[in-house]
Amino acid sequence: FPNDGNAPVKFSVNNKVKFDCTVKSGTVGEGKRYTIIKSGWDNGDHKSLGFRISVNRTNEAISNAVLSDSMESPGVTYKAGSFKIYKGTWDYSNGTWQLKNKTDVTSQYTVNATDTTFTINLGNISANDHFAVEYEAVVNYDAVDREVIKNKATIVGDNKKPYDSNSKVNIQIAGGEGVGYAFGIQVHKVDESNEPLKGAKFQVIRQATGQVLGEFE
């Protein structure tokens, strides 16, 4: 079906046309609007990830707006120098959102970033101030097939309570076996005399990232 216009509809039974007509088609409703919404993707090498934060599709006026972001998956860090801030007008048409009349305004703002967090003070946002913040991140280890990279963005202002948007990038490796995070382990705890040891605690740590997967007794 085209997004808008007339579309042919034909029903056949046993290779015989029973119903043949034209119907009018179009996009139903409007795209959902969020104060911010996060999207992320794997650039193909499973090392470089791309992210975008779409800001103010809701046409809000926010005083002293601050946008923050945190990388929640260990071993993944922002790529220095990759941050871009664009300003324009968010428009929903033909089933997709586009930032029309996009202008690069990166030089007008300061990105305060560490390896895994950043903040941008957007100042006083009017209802007509629409933004897209784009950046890249680096996976500093060999990711496994079906691994999920998690990331969260938040916007807050004097008249705006913290509003979050979460993003998940699914790593899909061609020929992967779908191992993901599935694992099993059995531990028999004994003392120096090979007797069962009570009250001992241990952690399961992922060697690639140092992430603690669990603590057990």
Language-model features, listed with the residues they occupy:
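Gram-positive cell-envelope targeting signals
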Residues: 40, 49-53, 62-67, 118-122, ...
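Serine/threonine-rich, low-complexity linker/repeat segments that form flexible spacers/stalks
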Residues: 2-62, 68-72, 151-194
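Short, ordered, surface-exposed loop/turn motifs in non-cytosolic proteins
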Residues: 62-64, 193-216
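Short, surface-exposed beta-strand/loop "edge" segments at domain boundaries and coil↔beta transitions
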Residues: 16-21, 91-98, 126-133, 163, ...
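Short, hydrophobic/aromatic beta-strand segments
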Residues: 61-68, 78-81, 199
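Hydrophobic beta-strand positions
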Residues: 89, 155, 189, 204-205
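Low-complexity, intrinsically disordered segments enriched in Ser/Thr together with acidic residues
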Residues: 1-15, 114-148
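A surface/secretory-pathway sequence property marking extracellular, secreted
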Residues: 70-117, 205-216
